Design a protein with these regions (language model features):
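AlphaC helix of the eukaryotic protein kinase fold
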Residues: 42-60
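C-terminal lobe helix-coil module of Hanks-type protein kinase domains
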Residues: 172-276
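Short secondary-structure boundary elements
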Residues: 287-295, 331-338, 343-349, 377, ...
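Conserved short submotifs of the Hanks-type protein kinase catalytic core
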Residues: 76-90, 94
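Activation segment signature within eukaryotic-like protein kinase domains
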Residues: 108-109
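Protein kinase catalytic-loop region centered on the HRD/HxD motif
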Residues: 114-124
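Conserved Walker-type P-loop NTP-binding/catalytic site
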Residues: 373-460, 508-514, 518, 528-538, ...
Length: 846
């Protein structure tokens, strides 16, 4: 029992893995209260964040049925939330696993829905609806929903792909999309699924999916249907009541109810029939269900054959069969906006069934010289998934990794620093010659990948936007795919077919793979047809395809069926109020729903000019944003497809509190996506642009004459805010920005410092066997040197040209190698200074 000054503790009434709840009396006014406190003596930063967010969220719920928060106290090292005590008991404890009689259920359920409706109207998504968080006062009948620890105040979230052991929410109740394995963002309808599971449990006394294993339970939410309610209870449950619960528990949000009003209307109709006639007849459910929020369905239209091709290929890879290969390469191609990335993520569900790993990385259009950028990003996500495993499982992975990597584990840690969290600090590797270092890197990297490829855990690697891949990454793909010992690996690459020609490095890589006997499968995505656009718009507006025919024909004509363009076009006409929700009773002739329907101004929409240029279209949209938002998004675009709040505060010279409203509104508008959870300051730190074309549109807002100036400023600020210990990890991003504006650097000392940074970047790229990137960095280092540098900064100049000689050799550029070697031999002051060049010149050329 805790002791908290100012409160008389009466009893503990609830205990979970993380928290305890006590009944108490506040001594100053004898007010009954509840105290919610974390159990851990030393709470994690994430737990503290959830508590602060819960208190803040509850304080923002200004309606009678909301639980009230009276204050936030501190007990030792943990916060204590002071909540009202209205004499309630959780439905979980009240029922004690017994089924609730139908009449009592129908008396409670509409009030629970009404409470949830008010929470949603306050723009809060609860994300943890379950009977333990629904509290009833049996005497007064008052119902309140509690526990807002993971609630979201955002209209939409993008849950990442996580280990099931670390998912937010109560696993038995979370929606398929909340698992992060459904290829879609999360909105208020996640609570409807959890509500459906809760209603199922209230009526049956059982959970719909009584699995114990976390991954198995996730798979049940994704793919399995629960037993019929009437097969589990003695009391006959009317089919329409079960139909309501089934609709709530639909696997995709589009198939569920779209409004709490619609759920409540159907439940109240059931209760009305039961009270007036003693029975419940069937009726068409969801007739009063209509969302007045504008939401474009996230499901794919017209891609059934392509999805089947992808899933069949994965099944081949994951099936244990000694007579067939278990490594495949699949290329997904098409113009920008065709939905290549979205299509690939449809593979989440079967991967979960096979207990496989899915990792992805994306090449950045503005940072093409960073070696292995997408590969490292993908493998870093894999390491993070492993860190969510239980300690015994993590120990098994540690043993596998150390056995496979041996004395060379440091090679991988230098590329993926987070791996050290699993295998611990590792000694530096032996220094070898350049060719031997290359060979070691290739061998160790292949061994590292093989650890995760097994029949128990097939591995899917998705590399997005291969048209922007660096040469080192393409060579690594070639290395992995031609490895005869690699099994249970499914490598998927996507690229824009209109940006690849016969001279592109990707073409050469694919030619080599075909010559090596690798079968390259391909999915080509084409624009949507008029019928598919018609169905998408009909689903969006909850109308029949016939009713929206005139609008959909115009949208198809304007967008040529490009899925991204269709979505953005619909958002544009909605923002312009040319597509709007008309409420009122007079609409009953249009639909069965008397709450309203969607209308549009066809003439206004017709005036929008047609364009095939998506960048121009997005740029036009962004120019309508407030100037401050345009500035922030254009700076974010300079940082990359993904960016973080810290770097944005540095380069914009704005505080987090100034940036937060801008980023939140941009997220609400679908321009950027949130990648991380709230931190201890209740800030989101990680973001990404929702699409490449949005990033390009934001970048295009910057005048061409100012781009070099801005990149130079970004490079300087990032460099200034990077410690010596962090420099190696951030070197490529810093140098890439500086190099875009290096010609504007006039001061000799700064030019030499930036030249030295390029030297460090070249050395790191060379060590990672990324010789093409290393050559670019070393050439820029040379350009930054003054003609008198051999005289005025001898050591730096010697280091740059000696390194250049070796890199030129390793990359097969023998003409500049000889030229730079001769220069070093001419300018070097001692024999010792010439050794590195002599070694390069003596290397065998075969």
């Amino acid at each position: 029992m805790i002791v908290l000054n100012g409160y008389d503790i009466l009893a503990q009434i609830y205990e979970s893995v993380n928290s305890e709840v006590y009944r108490a009396i506040r001594t100053v006014d004898n007010q009954p209260v509840m105290l919610k406190i974390l159990k851990q003596e030393y709470p994690t930063a994430q737990q503290l964040t959830h508590y602060k967010q819960e208190y803040k969220t509850i304080c923002g719920l200004n309606f009678e049925e909301a639980i009230k928060a009276y204050g936030l106290e501190t007990y030792r090292r943990t916060p204590v939330i002071i909540l009202e005590d209205f004499g309630g008991i959780s439905l979980k404890k009240w029922l004690e696993g017994k089924p609730l009689p139908l009449r009592e259920f129908l008396s409670l359920a509409p009030r629970i829905v009404a409470n949830l409706e008010k929470i949603h109207n306050a723009k809060v998504i609860h994300k943890d609806i379950n009977p333990a968080n629904i509290v009833l006062n049996p005497e007064t009948g008052q119902i309140k929903i509690i526990d807002f620890g993971i609630a979201s105040v955002l209209r939409r979230e993008n849950p990442g792909l996580k280990n099931p052991n670390v998912l937010e929410g109560t696993l038995a109740y979370i929606s398929p999309e909340q698992t992060g394995r459904m290829n879609r963002s999360l909105d208020y309808r996640t609570d409807f699924y959890s509500l459906g599971v809760s209603f199922y449990e209230l009526l049956t006394g059982q959970l719909p999916f009584p699995a114990n294993d976390a991954l198995e339970l996730v798979h049940c939410h994704l793919a399995k249907q629960p037993l019929e309610i009437n097969s589990l209870v003695k009391e006959k449950i009317p089919p329409v009541v079960e139909a309501i619960i089934r609709k709530l528990m639909a696997k995709t949000p589009e198939e569920r109810y779209q409004s709490a009003y619609g759920i409540r209307a159907d439940l109240e109709e059931c209760l009305r029939q039961l009270e007036t006639t003693g029975k419940i007849e069937d009726f068409v459910i969801a007739r009063q269900d209509l969302a007045n929020q504008f939401q474009i369905p996230q499901k794919l239209y017209g891609r059934e054959a392509e999805i089947a091709t992808l899933l069949t290929a994965f099944q081949r890879v994951a099936t244990v069969d000694k007579n067939s290969s278990h490594t495949e390469l699949m290329l997904v191609t098409g113009y920008s906006g065709m939905g290549k990335t979205t299509l690939v993520r449809e593979i989440y569900q079967p991967i979960t069934e096979k207990r496989g790993f899915f990792i992805s990385g994306k090449f950045d259009q503005f940072q093409r010289d960073i070696p292995y950028a997408a590969v490292i990003s993908a493998l870093t996500h894999l390491v993070k998934q492993l860190l969510g495993e239980s300690q015994p499982q993590l120990q098994l992975w540690r043993q596998k990794l150390l056995k496979s990597l041996g004395a060379n584990a440091r090679v991988i840690i230098d590329v993926i620093p987070q791996l050290e969290l699993i295998i611990g600090p590792q000694p530096e590797v032996l220094q070898l010659g350049a060719i031997a270092t290359q060979n070691r890197f290739n061998l160790v990297f292949k061994n590292f990948i093989r650890v995760f490829c097994s029949p128990e855990h097939p591995l899917v690697i998705f590399l997005d936007d291969l048209q922007w891949a660096d040469l080192a990454s393409l060579q690594l793909i070639e290395l992995i795919m031609l490895d005869g010992d690699m099994d249970y690996l499914f490598l998927i690459g996507s690229y824009r077919s209109n940006e690849i020609n016969s001279t592109h490095p990707l073409t050469a890589t694919l030619d080599k793979l075909e010559q090596g006997g690798i079968i390259i499968n391909q999915v080509i995505l084409k624009p949507l047809g008029p019928a598919q656009v018609n169905q998408l718009i009909a689903d969006t507006l909850n109308h029949s395809p016939e009713y929206v025919q005139s609008l959909s024909a115009l949208v198809w004509q304007k967008t040529h069926g490009n899925p991204f363009f269709v979505n953005e076009f619909l958002k544009t006409i909605y923002w312009e109020n040319w597509l709007f929700f008309q409420s009122g009773q007079e609409t009953t002739t249009k639909t069965d729903n008397n709450r309203g329907y969607w209308q549009w101004h066809l003439g206004q929409i017709q005036r929008i000019g047609s364009t095939d240029n998506l960048i121009q279209f997005m740029m036009g949209k962004m120019q309508k944003l407030p100037p401050e938002t345009q500035e922030v998004l254009s700076l974010a675009a300079c940082l990359g497809a993904e960016f973080n709040l810290y770097n944005l505060t540095v380069i914009s010279e704005k505080s987090p509190s100034e940036l937060l409203p801008i980023l939140t509104s941009s997220s609400e508008a679908g321009l950027i996506i949130l990648l991380s959870e709230l931190d201890e300051q209740l800030l989101i730190q990680e973001y990404k642009f929702a699409h490449d074309r949005i990033q390009q549109g934001a970048y295009a807002l910057i005048e061409d004459s100012q781009k070099a100036v801005i990149h130079l400023k970004i490079g300087r600020l990032l460099w200034q805010h990077t410690s010596v210990n962090e420099l190696s990890e951030k070197i490529f991003k810093i140098v890439d920005h500086l190099n875009l504006g290096y010609q504007l650097i006039s001061e000799k000392k700064e030019r030499e410092s930036v030249a030295n940074l390029n030297l460090l970047a070249a050395q790191k790229a060379k060590a990672a066997n990324a010789q093409a990137g290393a050559l670019k960095y070393i050439k820029t280092a040379q350009k930054l040197l003054k003609k008198s540098s051999w005289k005025n900064n001898y050591q730096l100049t010697l280091n740059i040209y000696s390194e250049a000689t070796e890199i030129a050799y390793l990359s097969g550029n023998f003409e500049p190698m000889q030229r730079w070697a001769n220069l070093v031999l001419k300018q070097a002051k001692t024999t010792l200074d010439k050794i590195k060049v002599y070694e390069a010149l003596r290397y065998p050329l075969c």
